[in-house]
Amino acid sequence: MQFLFNIQLFAHKKGQGSVKNGRDSNPKYLGVKKYDGEVVKAGNIIVRQRGTKYHAGNNMGIGKDHTLFALIDGYVKFERLGKNKKQISIYSEK
């Protein structure tokens, strides 16, 4: 006598599945750090930005990640260049 068994095993717990969400990136802390009229020292970061939302004016340096920083001690001055552009300068006196 011969017996033929056909055994099928199924999962006894539901699979977890996959999702495309569920991640978050670290904060980048972008934005204006020193505002119009504030006193700054040489090397102070004025704006951290992606691209040149603000352009470097007088006595300002620009980093490789478009960070604007002061080259001299003085006061921050936000200025308009034409209709759309904005620039930031540092002046030694108000």
Swiss-Prot record:
Q: Which residues form the propeptide?
A: 1-10
Key word Ribonucleoprotein present in the record? yes
Q: How is it modified after translation?
A: The N-terminus is cleaved by ribosomal processing cysteine protease Prp.
Which GO BP terms apply? translation
Cellular component per GO, a single term: cytosolic large ribosomal subunit
By its UniProt entry, which SUPFAM superfamilies does this protein fall under? Ribosomal L27 protein-like (SSF110324)
Would the keyword Ubl conjugation turn up in this protein's UniProt record? Answer: no
**Assigned keywords, A-Z:** Ribonucleoprotein, Ribosomal protein
Give the similarity note.
Answer: Belongs to the bacterial ribosomal protein bL27 family.
* HAMAP family listed in its UniProt record: Ribosomal_bL27
Q: What is this protein called?
A: Large ribosomal subunit protein bL27
- The organism of origin for this protein: Fusobacterium nucleatum subsp. nucleatum (strain ATCC 25586 / DSM 15643 / BCRC 10681 / CIP 101130 / JCM 8532 / KCTC 2640 / LMG 13131 / VPI 4355)
- Gene behind this protein: rpmA
